[in-house]
Amino acid sequence: MKVLWVALVITLLAGCQAEEVKPAPEPEVQLGQEWPGWQGSQPWEQALGRFWDYLRWVQTLSDQVQEELLSTQVIQELTVLMDETMKEVKAYREELEEQLGPVAQETQARVSKELQAAQARLASDMQDVRGRLAQYRSEVQAMMGHTTDELRDRLASHLRKLRKRLLRDAEDLQKRLAVYRAGALEGSERSVSAIRERLGPLVEQGRARAATVGTLASQTLRERAEAWHQKLRGRVEEMGTQARDHLEEMREQLDEVRAKVEEQGTQMRLQAEAFQARLKSWFEPLVEDMQRQWAGLVEKVQLAMATSSTSAPSENH
């Protein structure tokens, strides 16, 4: 068991040292593309995907609607999604720690510290995204009446960089949690194997003793030894069955958590669609009214120009 956790710690420390090396320049990734290579199925991974999907949906809206939403709505929605993601990460980490069982306290504390550091980096990346949108909103408000194309380009560039960093740290956390979970499952299996190894010699001793008693004693002693042997073997099988049932229960709990997250994802998607429909119903009358006012203004200007052109020759005469 200790050898397993020593190997686990070496793996995590090697990952930390690898992070200190500066990575090679990454190719540019457009915000509209999907997460490359992201195959997450855990609740926290799906929550993180919903965070970025919502941000990409906001960027597909028109300029006027987007600037109106950035006043309060988008920042609040991103905050809720960010909190949901970090909550799922924390819940998944605590669940793995419960499955870990009794191990060396120093080793468990070191591994837990590494996971908390990776979790903190992911939270910092998401806060940077939210802060960049808040800064963009302030700059847009300060430049009312001027072109905001430069600000939008700067925002897109910053979000691309933040997205790369967010993806890198999310993959790092995903790998660490996978190693952590593998260690927990392997530790449980090793515990079952250790029990079988300890009881195996006892079973063999029981068989040998039963054979010896059978040759030296009566048939009654032989039957009692055989009964003891059967009882001991039944106990070993029962302990093995309990261990397998425990592993199966753990898998069922993970499936239940995954189903709940999928249900939440469906609800959020329906809420987003309803919200989009409300936006459309709000702004379509406004746009139509502006078009009518503009058409009336153009008509008045044309009429005024026609009047001035007819009055000018009469004044010359």
UniProtKB/Swiss-Prot annotation:
Q: Where is this region: LDL and other lipoprotein receptors binding?
A: 158-168
Q: Where in the cell is it found?
A: Secreted; Secreted, Extracellular space; Secreted, Extracellular space, Extracellular matrix; Extracellular vesicle
- The annotated region (Specificity for association with VLDL) lies at 278-290
Q: Where are the sequence repeats?
A: 80-101, 102-123, 124-145, 146-167, 168-189, 190-211, 212-233, 234-255
What's one GO MF term for it?
A: protein homodimerization activity
Q: Does the keyword Translocase apply?
A: no
**SUPFAM superfamilies in UniProt:** Apolipoprotein A-I
GO-annotated biological processes: acylglycerol homeostasis; AMPA glutamate receptor clustering; amyloid precursor protein metabolic process; cellular response to lipoprotein particle stimulus; cholesterol efflux; cholesterol homeostasis; cholesterol metabolic process; chylomicron remnant clearance
| GO cellular component entries | chylomicron remnant; endoplasmic reticulum; extracellular exosome; extracellular matrix; extracellular space; glutamatergic synapse; Golgi apparatus; high-density lipoprotein particle
Q: Where is this region: Homooligomerization?
A: 266-317
- Which residues are annotated with the PTM Methionine sulfoxide? 143
**Which residues are recorded as binding heparin?**
162-165, 229-236
Q: List the Pfam families.
A: Apolipoprotein
Leader sequence range is: 1-18
Q: Where is this region: 8 X 22 AA approximate tandem repeats?
A: 80-255
Keywords, alphabetical: Chylomicron, Endosome, Extracellular matrix, Glycoprotein, HDL, Heparin-binding, Lipid transport, Lipid-binding, Oxidation, Phosphoprotein, Repeat, Secreted, Signal, Transport, VLDL
- What's the superkingdom here? Eukaryota
What about PTM? APOE exists as multiple glycosylated and sialylated glycoforms within cells and in plasma. The extent of glycosylation and sialylation are tissue and context specific.
Renumbered to this chain, region (Lipid-binding and lipoprotein association) spans: 210-290
Function statement = APOE is an apolipoprotein, a protein associating with lipid particles, that mainly functions in lipoprotein-mediated lipid transport between organs via the plasma and interstitial fluids. APOE is a core component of plasma lipoproteins and is involved in their production, conversion and clearance. Apolipoproteins are amphipathic molecules that interact both with lipids of the lipoprotein particle core and the aqueous environment of the plasma.
Q: Which family does it belong to?
A: Belongs to the apolipoprotein A1/A4/E family.
How this chain assembles, per its entry, is: Homotetramer. May interact with ABCA1; functionally associated with ABCA1 in the biogenesis of HDLs. May interact with APP/A4 amyloid-beta peptide; the interaction is extremely stable in vitro but its physiological significance is unclear. May interact with MAPT. May interact with MAP2. In the cerebrospinal fluid, interacts with secreted SORL1. Interacts with PMEL; this allows the loading of PMEL luminal fragment on ILVs to induce fibril nucleation.
Query: What is the name of the protein in this document?
Result: Apolipoprotein E
The species is Physeter macrocephalus
